[in-house]
Amino acid sequence: MEGQPRGSRGPLEKPLPAATHPTLSSLGAVFILLKSALGAGLLNFPWAFYKAGGMLPTFLVALVSLVFLISGLVILGYAASVSGQTTYQGVVRELCGPAMGKLCEICFLTNLLMISVAFLRVIGDQLEKLCDSLLPDAPQPWYAAQNFTLPLISMLVIFPLSALREIALQKYTSILGTLAACYLALVITVQYYLWPQGLIRQPGPLLSPSPWTSVFSVFPTICFGFQCHEAAVSIYCSMWNQSLSHWTLVSVLSLLACCLVYTLTGVYGFLTFGPEVSADILMSYPGNDTAIIVARVLFAVSIVTVYPIVLFLGRSVMQDFWKKSYWATRGPPVLADPSGPWVRLPLTFLWVVVTLTMALFLPDLSEIISIIGGVSSFFIFIFPGLCLICAVDTEPMGPRVKCCLEAWGILSVLVGTFIFGQSTAVAMVELL
C-alpha cells in the first residue's frame, strides 16, 4: 500500500474515515506526533535511569516498550480505517462496544485533564526558577509569581493556540516545540563534555545491584513520556495519505526520533550526576548558567506548544457529549455544530480555566506522574490491543494471520494491565 494516495485502498481495507478536508502532510504528522511525545517527561528521564538501577536495565525496558509503542500507533491507524471513526474514543466505541467506549471516554478525559494540569505546573515552575536565576539575591517581584504569570500566558498564548479547529494547524507550533525540546537534549549532552564552572563532577554512575523489580519503576516515565497515542487517530484522519504502510512509516520515524532525544537526555543527564540526579534534570545544574537559563525558557515554550494538542483531544470528548445534549438537538442552529465557534470557543475556554485553577491551587503534582503514566497504559497498550482483537473479526484474512494478530492483541492488553496495576499501586503507596 506504500505510496497510495488517500482514497485508494487494498483489498482488505475498509473505507477510510471521512475527515473534513484532510490536508496534513507526512512531515507535519511526524512533527505533531513527535511534539505530543516530547513533553514534561523529558525532565524525568535521567532520574528514571537512576530509579531503574542504571543504563542497561533502562535500555532493555525502553527497547521492549518501543516495540509496543510503535505497534500501538499502527494498530490505531488500522482500527480507524476499519471503523471509519475520526477520534480515539469513537474508534473504541465502534469496535469494542458502547460500554468500552464509555470507559475510554472517562479515562481519556481524566488522563488529558491531569496532563494539562501537569503541563501548566511545569510552565509555571520553569518561569519561577527562571526569575530566581535572573534575580538571585532579590525578593520575588509580584509579576514573577505563578499566580500572575500562568493566567497571563494561558489567556494570551495558550487559549488562542488551543482555539484552532483542526489538529493539522498545530504542525507549525509543533516544529518550534520540537526544536526547543531538542535544544534541551543538546545542552545536557554538551554540558557533560564541557563541565562548565559551577558544575560538580560526580563519581561514575556505577550503582550497587538493585532488585530486579526496580526496572518496573521506569514504565510510568516511559508511558508518560511517549504518550502520543491519544492523538494518533486524529492525526491519522487529518493526513492526506492514509495508507496503512505510510502511517507505519510515519509512526516509526516519529518514535525513533523521540527515542533519540529521550535517550540523549537520559544517558548524559545520568552520566553527569549519577545517583545525585534530580527528578527535574534542570534543577541539578547551576542556576546562573546561561545555557540552562535558555533551556528553561525554550522548554517552557515546548510545553506551551504541546498543551493545545492535549486540549484538542480532550475537547473532542466534550464535543461528543455536546452532540447528545439538549442544546445540540433542540437549541439554536448555531449550537448544533460542536466544532463551530459558538461551541468550540466556550469549551476551549472552560478547559483552560479548569486546568489553570487546578494548577494554581492543587499541591505539587510531581508525585502523581506515576498515576498519569499508569492511566496512559490504557491508551498505549490496552485499548489498541482490544481494538486489534475486535478489528480482525471484521476483516477477511487467513486463520494463521488472524491467530497471530489476536495473540499480539491479547499480549498488549496483558502488558498494559500489568503496567497500570504496578505503577498505580506504587504511586498510591508513595502518596500515602
From Swiss-Prot:
Give the transmembrane region(s): 29-49, 59-79, 103-123, 144-164, 175-195, 215-237, 253-273, 292-312, 345-365, 368-388, 409-429
Protein localization: Membrane; Cytoplasm, Cell cortex; Cell projection, Axon
GO process terms (BP): amino acid transport; aspartate metabolic process; neuron projection development; optic nerve development; response to virus; retina development in camera-type eye; retinal pigment epithelium development; viral genome replication
Listed under catalytic activity are: L-glutamine(out) = L-glutamine(in); L-alanine(in) = L-alanine(out); L-histidine(out) = L-histidine(in); L-aspartate(out) = L-aspartate(in)
Q: Which UniProt keywords apply?
A: Amino-acid transport, Cell projection, Cytoplasm, Membrane, Transmembrane, Transmembrane helix, Transport
Gene3D superfamilies hit by this protein: Amino acid/polyamine transporter I
Q: Which GO terms describe its cellular component?
A: axon; cell cortex; membrane
Predominant subcellular localization, coarse grouping: membrane
The membrane topology of this protein is: Multi-pass membrane protein
Q: What family, per the record?
A: Belongs to the amino acid/polyamine transporter 2 family.
What PANTHER family does the database record attribute to this sequence? AMINO ACID TRANSPORTER (PTHR22950), SODIUM-COUPLED NEUTRAL AMINO ACID TRANSPORTER 8-RELATED (PTHR22950:SF226)
Its protein name is: Solute carrier family 38 member 8
What is the originating organism of this protein? Answer: Mus musculus
Lineage, opening ranks = Eukaryota, Metazoa, Chordata, Craniata, Vertebrata
